[in-house]
Amino acid sequence: MCSARKLLRGGAGSAGGECDEDGAAPAGRVEEPEHGASPRRRRPQDEGEQDIEEPQNHSGEPIGDDYKKMGTLFGELNKNLLNMGFTRMYFGERIVEPVVVLFFWLMLWFLGLQALGLVAVLCLVIIYVQQ
């Protein structure tokens, strides 16, 4: 019979404290203790192989944009700008977030039209090269 104490301690020769319906240890898996580790401090063999489950939305609401999940400065500033009434700009397939528009206006103010044009051309070249 497999008791709770045997399950917690990995008891009586069973592999990791697992028991089948009869209370006997399963025959296929043998776990050897790590050198110098007590049975309670052993970690399961497949601990590194466990998949990290992503949070799922069970409320029926659509999952929001990535910036709502991130706690980055870009995401938080973008979320605040959207809440204040700034809108996204749509250029065909591309969506320009309000924080990017604000960044370009600040660059235009500080650096002037030539520097803004240079940065815009560099951004377009980077986008073109990535495609």
From Swiss-Prot:
Subcellular location: Membrane
Main location class: membrane
Transmembrane spans: 99-119
GO cellular component, one term: Golgi apparatus
Annotated InterPro entries: DUF4605, FAM241_domain
Top-level lineage group: Eukaryota
Modified residues (Phosphoserine): 14
Keywords: Membrane, Phosphoprotein, Transmembrane, Transmembrane helix
Membrane topology per record: Single-pass membrane protein
Region (Disordered): 1-67
The family this protein is said to belong to: Belongs to the FAM241 family.
Name of the featured protein: Uncharacterized protein FAM241A
Organism: Mus musculus (Mouse)
Gene name of the record: Fam241a
